[in-house]
From Swiss-Prot:
Main location, first listed in the record: nucleus
Record-level GO cellular component terms: nucleus
Annotated Polar residues bias: 103-122, 249-267, 342-359, 781-802, 1058-1075, 1373-1384
Transmembrane segments: none
Organism ancestry: Eukaryota, Metazoa, Chordata, Craniata, Vertebrata
GO molecular function term, any single one: zinc ion binding
Keyword Plastid in record: no
Species this protein is from: Danio rerio
Expression tissues: Widely expressed with highest levels in eye, spleen and ovary.
Protein name: Zinc finger protein 687b
Family matches, as PROSITE patterns: ZINC_FINGER_C2H2_1, ZINC_FINGER_C2H2_2
Extent of Acidic residues compositional bias: 1080-1111
Function (record text): May be involved in transcriptional regulation.
Recorded family membership: Belongs to the krueppel C2H2-type zinc-finger protein family.
Length: 1431
């Protein structure tokens, strides 16, 4: 990998939006700043001039001014990185960069670090003793590193396990010992004492039985000098301080990017070549551990497993430049002693910590190979956002002082290559940015792409390694020195150990336990986990836990993570995490710092060190307001747009849904499946669609400006879905700080089944865009989360179920509407009469009959129109309806009824016949009520039309293109026209003719039938029966609704009754709750309803009573109210009116009630929108009662528009006034006239025409001679009053006295409805209806025609009270003194044949003149006649 080119530093900064910061500026940072040792932008902390570049730098001896008592802040960094080091400029052999991409000196060991390679005693280390050198160096570096609170690398990532001979338990035990040792050295004296024993142990590391003898890989004689900073010798410390002054870590960081010479080492090259094949998975993320907060930082810098032959020390003081020869073996694990409080103050001092580190047992050391770090696409990446990773890591280490530094992670097996990112929000973040910018590349836990570099850079917070680094003893502040070693283990993992000695300055930051706790509270960290399994990342205090996926982790880590997570969830106000869009940074008290690398860390308010607070710096450079936008951002945006706008090369996936699942599975499946609106893929199950949104293709991190949080998406569809959610609210998604990284294979597969599949996500049941409520400790989905996007949050897999398809929910039981007339149905112990299934309640039985289950032959074609039935039980019960067989089971509710009331129950209570067949468009999911409608819709809205060349297979979408093709390619076809072809949108079949396409639609639409319900009172269609029933309750039967008009107006609720006709079909409305319906279907439905209405008019009285009882009287206007004549009060109910009359006026006469009933119950409504005038052909109607008679057609004046007579109390509509009067008399118990009044009928009553209605006879005045005195009695005893027929209205005459009096002198033609007040004109009109062949007999009173004389005679007697021969004797209406004039008795008295008017006393010679005159009196005569008072 030596030939791999390292990306230019400027390019790296540009790629991750990290502002370019000059190295000098980084060096000039105040020593008290936690991250002063690092360049804010990844630049070195010291001037490049301070460090010698080239081979000579490796030979430089450490500064003699280094004080052995100084307490340098040394950070031990273990990096599992995907880094491509550049080959050394001067050497032919490609050597790892002196500086790793995380900003540390590469394992190639550059000599530019001005540190002598001699032993602590001043002597040069032998080549064979290189193993001891790294050990001591690691000790020194680790101790110093733990003191460095500002170091962003305060978190150490254990990527590899120990040697085969060392178990994890042993490692943990050793860690505890190290922690105890560090605690002992917290005081200055203990630190000095500890240095001496540390040296021998470090020196004897080579002889350790656990590790094989060191194999010198570097030829440079100054091997010892490179490791001397980590050695525990006091002399080393003095040398280190001087060396650091000349060549601090910053220099090493800057060199690889600034083009400073890098040392070439054959040993590095050889080690790399040997292990290159064995390292398929290089660390994907930079693991940094720092114990600034904990008094007992971990002592182990890093231990990785590698082949014994190429063993090198895993850790090297970061401040020390490493020469090829001096490169220590990986087996040497430096131990660091805890930093003393004074050392914390002097965190910038670079004095070497000679005796602080306690050498670890050799058994714990694993031989490791020093190799170049290389990019490996296979390295696993934790499946959680970077911001969330730090929390869990901090959680592990900060739960307890010992746990913070526990080396369990370091001792893990190499397979556990998941990398932890502990991001401390200390002020050292800026300084760490420089190193992280370079090393963040490998740092990305989830992505092994260079963008990870910016992760650490932006995170910029130092973290504690799991016992890898320990703060060293006290020493005078010195320039910062860094020693970096890159190690490749036998398992293929790469470990980088960095030992750094801080320069002079305040005490080491974050060295105390309290500071470590502060880190836990102030940052979000990931929990370590297995390679493929993610653990939940606990978020900082006030921060919601933000894991992206679950990782399998050690029990100790999980325990620590769970503690922090519980703590976080209890304290956090917002704990919402989107399945596909994971909130990465949620601000607590400080603004969110979205890290480009995926980790966003908020800086802590202050870190306490020795009781003091350290100033905090932004956790991420992205968080700073003045961040410089990288010049490569535009290219990144272009790549992002390309991803979003690129066309999917694969065809859209559509499952084969031709065979539905078995009904017992209960899997409701749409005809076209569940479709992703972003890419067009469809899935058979809703769970599959949820998985589709949760798939992991790449990692896209953006800061959503609308959500005000950092979000991570793992595929394009989830990002577009999030943007769609904003669009639905009228917003355009705006995002910033874009970061894109690939994901590893381990992340792409296998992470979705970490939770039981059968468990349902709590947010699935909620409507889109509503947040789900989850119990404490779990991570609820954000309000912007879509139900299909919800995915299990890492770490909460055990508590929060993964998204899954919702099981088929039983439909809500729709109980029958109340029906007073109908009898209660029998439910035999709530047992289904069809399948004998037993239920516990009526609601369950009703639900059983209404639940939709796949059933063959569920469509009944015998019904007109056809209907679909929900299940087999309903089908069986429905089929018996057609066969008229018992038991009469309602297909809707399962109840058993008597045959007499069964039909009423079906029509009025359960609305069974409201079922229809609808069709759902597979493309837009719109439901249509008719086959032709949906076919037309699909063809016009979705099907593609192409214009095909008649001479070749080419087809074009436009006629112009096709014609241009013909002209250019086929010039011979001069008059040829492109042929239109039609492509089916559902199967891509092409047809040359549209009728063939329509026929083809039938094959698809047969599978797209859905249940729809049509309101029986109007033409509205509903997809749910419950919606239809609510509509009926509110619009047609509600108490708050005015007296309902016939269902023919455009609005059944508000249309006045006076403007409608008998045709019960409202104008078509496109309401939101309606389903689409074709015009032809509407007419068909209207005709059906009209026919049903006609039948209802002829139904028995029982049905009419049912209608009356069901409908609640609610007047619409004054004409429909009960009005008191005395006080002019109005009452909506008849009972209220009667009570008022009795209580207020003391009497309620039947005659007065009769008149009021006629006024209240009878009103005429016309279907046409505009009412015709009341005068036609000069005939003016002046009706005393409020009954509109505008029946005449406005155009012809001869035909009527199916007028309907409306009963306001029963809300029934009748086509004939006679039927309405009968209904009022029979159903409401009111008669117009009493028998006592009828005795005077021959002298006082004048016949008037009945209202409109086919077959009803007119109520013309009987002009035949006066009957005998007993005529009135005959009128009362007319037989056959109950006969029915077109011209035989039952007991019509008794209902007409009031009507006759109000319509005095009006003659109406029954066949056509023509009305006139002129008898002669009426006689001239009626012959036009006479049929000489079929019905030669015509009644001159009303114009009705009959086939036989007997029928005519019976009609005259029943309808007009004319006996045989009377009609002949009285040819004109005025010839009968009995009926023709109220003064007929006086006419006889006159003797001269003259007649006089009883109202005004005028005398006339002819009865016809009297009849004409009498019409001028109107109600005056009626009033006089009723009260028997002379006028």
């Amino acid at each position: 990998m030596g030939d791999m080119k390292t990306p230019d530093f400027d390019d790296l900064l540009a790629a991750f939006d990290i502002p370019d910061i000059d190295a000098k500026e980084a060096i000039q940072s105040a020593p008290d700043e936690v991250e002063g040792h690092q360049g804010a932008g990844g630049a070195s902390l010291i001037k490049s001039g301070d460090a010698s570049v080239g081979e000579s730098s490796a030979l430089r001896s450490p500064s003699p001014s280094t004080d052995s008592q100084s307490d340098p802040s040394i950070v031990s960094v273990i990096v599992k990185n995907r880094v491509r080091p550049e080959p050394f400029d001067g050497g032919e052999n490609s050597v790892p960069d002196p500086l790793n991409h995380n900003g540390f000196v590469s394992s190639g060991g550059s000599v530019h670090m001005s540190q002598s390679r001699g032993q602590p005693n001043g002597e040069q280390w032998p080549v064979c003793s290189s193993k001891a050198i790294p050990e001591t160096a690691g000790q020194h570096g680790s101790s110093g590193g733990s003191k460095q609170g500002s170091n962003i690398f305060n978190k150490l990532k254990p990527l590899m396990a120990q040697g085969a001979g060392d178990s994890v338990g042993r490692a943990r035990k050793m860690q505890l010992l190290q922690q105890q040792h560090m605690q002992q050295e917290m005081n200055l004296e203990g630190a000095d004492k500890a240095k001496a024993p540390a040296n021998p142990s470090g020196a004897s590391g080579a002889a350790s039985p656990f590790f094989p003898p060191p194999k010198p890989l570097l030829s440079t004689p100054s091997t010892a000098s490179s490791s001397s900073p980590s050695s525990s010798s006091p002399s080393v410390g003095s040398r280190v301080s001087g060396a650091v002054a000349s060549s601090p870590l910053a220099t090493s960081l800057t060199e690889p990017f600034n083009g400073t010479p890098r040392l070439s080492s054959s040993a590095f090259r050889r080690a790399d070549s040997e292990e290159e094949d064995s390292d398929p998975d290089s660390g994907g993320s930079l693991v940094i551990h720092e114990s600034p907060d904990s008094p007992t930082p971990p002592k182990l810098s890093r231990r990785l497993r590698s082949s014994p032959e190429n063993s090198q020390s895993p850790s090297i003081p970061p401040s020390t430049s490493i020469s090829p020869n001096a490169y220590p073996k990986p087996g040497d694990v430096p131990s660091a002693s805890p930093a003393s409080p004074r050392a914390q103050q002097n965190w910038l001092s670079t004095a070497a910590q000679t005796g602080n580190g306690k050498s670890l047992p050799q058994e714990e050391r694993n031989p490791e190979h020093v190799i170049e770090e290389r990019d490996s696409p296979e390295s696993p990446e934790p499946e959680m956002p970077k911001s969330s990773m730090p929390t869990s890591a901090v959680t592990k280490r900060s739960c307890s002082p010992a746990a913070a530094s526990s080396p369990s992670a370091a001792l893990r097996e190499p397979k556990e290559e998941d990398e932890e990112m502990e991001v401390d929000k200390a002020s050292t973040e800026n300084g760490q940015d420089a190193e992280n910018t370079d090393g963040g590349k490998g740092d990305t836990d989830k992505i092994e792409v260079d963008p990870a570099q910016s992760l650490e850079a932006e995170t910029g917070s130092s973290t504690n390694s799991d016992g890898k680094a320990a703060t060293g003893g006290k020493a005078p502040s010195r320039p910062l020195k860094v020693r970096i070693k890159t190690i490749k283990t036998s398992t293929g993992g790469i470990t980088r150990t960095v030992t750094r000695v801080a320069g002079k300055g305040g005490a080491a930051a974050n060295a105390g336990k309290d500071a470590n706790k502060g880190q836990t509270g102030g940052r979000a960290g990931p929990v370590k986990g297995g390679k493929k399994n993610d653990t939940t990342a606990g978020q900082g205090v006030k921060c919601s836990t933000l894991p992206v996926s679950t990782l399998e982790a050690s029990s100790a880590m999980l325990a620590a993570a769970s503690k922090v997570q519980n703590k976080m969830t209890m304290q956090s106000d917002k704990t919402k995490v989107s399945a596909t869009a994971v909130s990465i940074t949620k601000a607590t008290t400080l603004p969110v710092a979205p890290a480009v690398g995926g980790i966003s860390v908020r800086p802590t308010v202050g870190k306490t060190t020795n009781g003091g607070t350290m100033p905090c710096k932004p956790a991420s450079i992205v968080n700073s307001t003045g961040a410089v936008i990288s010049r490569s951002q535009s290219s990144l945006v272009e790549a992002f747009n390309k991803i979003l706008n690129s066309k999917n090369l694969l065809p859209s996936y559509r499952p084969d849904l031709s065979t539905p699942p078995p009904p017992e599975w209960g899997l409701p499946m749409p005809a076209a499946g569940y479709r992703c609106l972003e890419c067009g893929d469809s899935f058979a199950l809703e769970r599959s669609l949820a998985r589709h949104y949760d798939r992991r293709s790449l990692r896209i991190e953006v800061t959503c400006n609308h959500c005000a949080k950092r979000l991570a998406f793992f595929n394009k569809c989830s990002l577009l879905l999030h943007a769609r959610e904003h669009k639905e609210r009228g917003l355009v998604m705006q995002c910033s700080h874009l970061v894109m990284r690939p994901v590893t294979v381990e992340q792409m597969i296998g992470q979705q089944d970490t939770t039981p599949i059968g468990m349902l996500s709590p947010s699935l049941s909620s409507p889109p865009l509503t947040s789900s409520t989850t119990p404490a400790g779990t991570i609820p989905a954000p309000s912007t989360s879509s139900p299909l996007k919800d995915s299990p949050s890492p770490g909460t897999a055990s508590t929060q179920p993964s998204p899954a398809r919702r099981g088929p929910q039983s439909p809500q039981a729709l109980m029958p509407l109340p029906c007073k007339k109908g009898e209660a149905l029998q439910y035999h112990n709530f047992k289904c009469p069809e399948c004998q299934a037993q239920f516990l309640s009526k609601a369950e039985l009703v639900t059983h009959f209404q639940q939709i289950r796949a059933t063959p032959n569920s469509t009944c074609t015998l019904c007109s129109p056809p209907m679909m039935l929900p299940n087999w039980c309903s089908v069986s019960a429905h089929q018996r309806i057609h066969k008229h067989r018992a038991p009469h089971v309602c297909p809707e509710c399962g109840g058993t009824a008597r045959q007499a009331t069964f039909q009423t129950h079906l029509e009025e209570s359960c609305l069974h016949f409201a079922r229809r067949i609808g069709y759902r468009c597979s493309s837009c999911q719109v439901v249509f009520g008719g086959l032709n409608s949906i076919k037309s819709h699909i063809q016009t809205a979705h099907c593609e039309v192409f214009h095909k060349c008649p001479n070749c297979p080419m087809a074009f979408k436009s006629a112009q293109s096709a014609q241009g093709h013909i002209t250019s390619q086929h010039p011979a076809l001069t008059a040829a026209q492109a042929k239109m072809i039609y492509k089916c949108v559902m199967c891509d079949t092409v047809f040359t003719q549209k009728p063939l396409l329509y026929m083809h639609f039938d094959t698809h639409l047969a599978k797209q039938k859905v249940h729809v319900f049509k309101c029986p009172d109007c033409t509205k269609l509903y997809a749910q029966k419950g919606s239809m029933m609510e509509h009926i309750k509110t619009a047609h039967r509600g108490l708050s609704v005015k007296a309902e008009t016939p269902p023919t107006t455009s609005s059944p609720v508000s249309a006045p009754a006076g403007n409608s006709t008998s045709k019960p079909k409202p104008a078509t409305e496109n309401n939101s709750d309606e389903l689409s319906q074709g015009p032809g279907e509407e007419e068909e439905e209207g005709e059906d309803e009209e026919g049903e209405q006609e039948g209802e008019e002829r139904e028995d009285e029982e049905e009419e009573e049912n209608e009356e009882e069901e409908q609640v009287s609610s007047p619409e206007s004054g004409n429909m109210e009960w009005r008191c004549k005395e006080c002019k009060k109005r009452f909506p109910e008849r009972e209220d009116y009667i009570d008022h009359m009795k209580n207020e006026h003391g009497t309620v006469g039947n005659e007065e009630i009769s008149l009021q009933i006629v006024r209240a119950f009878i009103q005429f409504s016309q279907q046409s929108s505009s009412a015709c005038p009341n005068n036609t052909r000069g005939r003016q109607e002046s009706l005393p009662l409020p009954v509109s008679r505008t029946l005449l057609n406005c155009k012809s004046g001869l035909k009527i528009n199916k007028g309907s007579w409306h009963c306001s109390e029963g809300k029934r509509t009748f086509s004939s006034r006679l039927i309405l009067e009968k209904h009022i008399r029979v159903r409401h118990g009111i008669r117009s006239r009493q028998t006592t009044d009828r005795t005077n009928a021959p002298n006082t009553r004048k016949r008037s025409l009945p209202a409109d209605g086919a077959g009803s006879s007119s109520e013309l005045d009987n002009e035949s001679g006066a009957p005998p005195a007993g005529g009135g009695t005959d009128t009362d005893d007319v037989p056959g009053e109950d006969t029915s027929g077109p011209a035989k209205r039952t007991r019509a005459s008794e209902n007409r006295p009031v009507e006759q009096e109000e319509e005095d002198g009006t003659f109406r033609c029954t066949p056509c409805g023509f009305t006139t007040q002129d008898w002669e004109e009426f006689q001239r009109h009626i012959p036009v209806h006479c049929d000489a062949e079929n019905a030669p007999q015509q009644c001159l009173q009303c114009g009705a025609c009959f086939a036989s004389a007997g029928s005519l005679s019976r009609h005259k007697f029943i309808t007009h009270r004319l006996r045989q021969g009377q009609h002949d004797r009285n040819a004109s209406p005025g010839a009968s003194p009995q009926y023709g004039s109220p003064s007929s008795p006086k006419a006889g008295e006159d003797g001269d044949g003259g007649v006089s008017c009883r109202v005004c006393g005028r005398r006339f010679d002819k009865a016809s003149d009297l009849n004409t005159h009498f019409r001028t009196h109107g109600m005056a005569f009626i009033t006089a006649h009723r009260t028997d008072k002379p006028l």
